[in-house]
UniProtKB/Swiss-Prot annotation:
Coiled coil: none annotated. Keywords: ATP-binding, Chaperone, Nucleotide-binding, Phosphoprotein, Stress response. One of its GO terms (molecular function) is ATP binding. NCBIfam families: PRK00290.1, prok_dnaK. Gene3D superfamilies: 1.20.1270.10, 3.30.420.40, Actin, Chain A, domain 4, Substrate Binding Domain Of DNAk, Chain A, domain 1. This is Chaperone protein DnaK. Induction: By stress conditions e.g. heat shock. Belongs to the heat shock protein 70 family. Residues 616-625 have a biased composition (Basic and acidic residues).
Length: 638
């Protein structure tokens, strides 16, 4: 088994880590940062940008820059939360043929797992660059309150990215792993309060020493998969829009460029107000009318921000209360409170959490990195590198089937430790009924229609019998990823039917395979592009150094040599403008060949007269410190 990386696939930012020599290493990306924005952009020339490069161009390309796509994963287009998001994002959310929420970019419909796969590919590449070897296996985290469809969709994203997802692990559980691995032995109970970019989770976790093993047992979990930092940003954006309208009489709502600038400004202001009591948002030329350009200048205080979002923070308290009740734990028995997710840096969040739990949250856990670190530890456990850790997670929501009268009958209650298997015997509702439909549901409501439908299947060819006589045994089996397998068996005939719940939404196997193939094609294109860029850079460097050498050599170069080198230079410069790597490499070879005699002459002369060579060498060293940069003209589209 190879190295198993841990990936925190976040709504706003993502992070990757690995266990090395007993320590967890959070891996820096190519830009030198430990977290990567979960943003994907599709450029006009077909290039796919991920992370910081996508974020940088968002203002000029709002319709094709996708962010917070995790909020759509495993969701139906008609869900109220999706409809609310449609009003708030500049990109297009559309209805897929199966009713799922997809996005549309440049006229092409794309599934959220397909887009999330681009972020996972970036995380995979980050790990591969650091380790110097191919990575094919990962543990990926999801919000604890993700339902079965959302977990399946996350696993699909991993497959599309070329990863074998060894385990889906809940984010708060991962954070507890990161926190508890190096703590003193002994039993203690912790609360993990995880308020991220798009989701909120709270888990009650007991960390115990059992026969020399660290045992992490999740006692209860609760949350809201549509509450996070993005919602805080939206409140600020709305405030800025209202203030601007009061002053100018103009609404910015219909202007995607202005809204994208506002989004970035809101995020920046929110972060600044965690450490300052006041900040100013200054966006010149935000829009224009007949009287000329308009500028947005708004001062906002921390107290104003808190008044805008206080109800959002309050919404996190009820799930905390429910989780404690479900765990059967008194609030006074909590030893530590761990804050996870960037939004927990907000002073108001910390204040309310401290007030509710009656104790200060720990400050020694990095809220942006703890989840990825825990995922890496779980990866090491699965790989056999860590042997003294046992993780007992739970199913976050009740699972059951629809029975007569539209009632949901539970088979596996919420907060049941997984993996688990439960069976129950049901019967027919009518005389001589020859088939039953097993309708699998997830949720806490008694009325079947009020819960999330995970899928349906039929058990047919039941022998004729009066109602209530046939015995149909339904078995629910949840694996360690929290993914459900359901079976139904006629006990009289032994006939059985079983499925892995793929949900009545989600991607088909054919769709996933096609996306995997597309990703492989893109990967090959990316590799070719990198190789071409490398060849161009090598060619550019050789052109520069050769021209400098000719200038330094002066009259020591014969006319014949100069002509040959000039011809090779022109040929290489022309090749660099083209797209053929082999041609560039051939022209590099040619130029190297014709310029080699001149280089040898210069070297021999320097060897004879080292003092004369010292000055140019110093100048060359200075010049070599200069980093080349490429600039692209930004055209105003008016």
């Amino acid at each position: 088994m190879g190295r198993i990386i841990g990936i925190d696939l976040g709504t706003t930012n993502s992070c990757v880590s690995i266990l090395e020599n007993g320590n967890v290493k959070v891996i820096d990306n190519a830009e030198g940062t430990r977290t990567t924005p979960s943003i994907i952009a599709y450029a006009n020339d077909g290039e796919i940008l991920v992370g910081q490069s996508a974020k940088r161009q968002a203002v000029t390309n709002p319709h094709n820059t996708l962010y917070a796509v995790k909020r759509l994963i495993g969701r139906k287009f008609d869900e109220q939360v999706v409809q609310k998001d449609i009003q708030m994002v500049p990109y297009k959310i559309v209805k897929a043929d199966n009713g799922d929420a997809w996005v549309e970019v440049n006229g092409q419909k794309m599934a959220p797992p397909q887009i999330s796969a681009e972020i996972l590919k970036k995380m995979k590449k980050t790990a591969e660059d650091y380790l110097g070897e191919a990575v094919t296996e990962a543990v990926i985290t999801v919000p604890a309150y993700f339902n079965d469809s959302q977990r399946q969709a996350t696993k699909d994203a991993g497959r599309i990215a070329g990863l074998d997802v060894k385990r889906i692990i809940n984010e708060p559980t991962a954070a507890a792993l990161a926190y508890g691995m190096d703590k003193a032995k002994g039993d203690h109970t912790v609360i993990v309060y995880d308020l991220g970019g798009g989701t909120f989770d709270v888990s009650v976790i007991e960390i115990a020493e059992v026969d020399g093993e660290h045992q992490f047992e999740v006692l209860a979990t609760n949350g809201d998969t549509f509450l996070g930092g993005e919602d805080f940003d939206i409140r600020l954006i709305d405030y800025f829009v209202d203030e601007f309208k009061k002053e100018s009489g103009m609404s910015l709502k219909g202007d995607p460029l202005a809204m994208q600038r506002l989004k970035e400004a809101a995020e920046k202001a929110k972060i600044e107000l965690s450490s300052s009591t006041q900040t100013e948002v200054n966006l010149p030329y935000i829009t224009a009318d007949a009287t000329g350009p308009k500028h947005l200048v708004v001062k906002i205080s921390r107290s104003k921000l808190e008044s805008l979002v206080e109800d959002l923070v309050q919404r996190t308290i009820e799930p905390c209360r429910i989780a404690l009740k479900d765990a059967g734990i008194d609030i006074g028995k909590i030893n530590d409170v761990i804050l996870v997710g960037g939004q927990t840096r907000m002073p108001l969040v910390q204040k309310l959490v401290t007030e509710f739990f009656g104790k200060e949250a720990r400050k020694d856990v990095n809220p942006d990195e703890a989840v990825a670190m825990g995922a890496a530890i779980q990866g090491a456990v699965l790989a056999g590198d860590v042997k003294d850790v046992l993780l007992l997670d739970v199913s976050p929501l009740t699972l059951g089937i629809e029975t007569m009268g539209g009632v949901m009958t539970a088979l596996i209650e919420k907060n049941t430790t997984i993996p688990t298997k439960k069976s129950q015997v049901f019967s027919t509702a009518d005389d001589n009924q020859n088939a039953v439909t097993i309708h699998v549901l997830q949720g806490e409501r008694k009325q079947a229609g009020q819960n999330k439908s995970l899928g349906k299947f039929d058990l047919a060819e039941i022998p004729p019998a009066p109602r209530g006589v046939p015995q149909i045994e339904v078995t629910f089996d949840i694996d360690a990823n929290g993914i459900l397998h359901v079976g139904a068996k006629d006990k009289a005939t032994g006939k059985q039917q079983s499925i892995v719940i793929k949900a009545n939404s989600g991607l088909s196997e054919e769709e996933i395979q096609q996306m995997v193939r597309d990703a492989e094609v893109n990967s090959e294109e990316d590799r070719k592009f990198e190789e071409l860029a490398s060849a161009r850079n090598q060619g550019d460097a050789l052109v520069h150094s050769t021209r400098k050498m000719i200038a330094d050599a002066g009259d020591k170069v014969t006319a014949e040599e100069k002509t040959a080198v000039e011809a090779a230079l022109v040929a290489l410069e022309a090749a660099i403008k083209g797209d053929d790597k082999a041609v560039i490499e051939a022209k590099v070879e040619e130029l190297s060949k014709v310029s080699a005699p001149i280089a040898q002459k210069m070297y021999a002369e320097q060897a004879e007269n080292p003092e004369a060579a010292a000055k140019p060498a110093e100048e060359t060293a200075k010049a070599d410190d200069v980093v080349d940069a490429e600039f692209e003209e930004v055209k105003d589209h008016k």
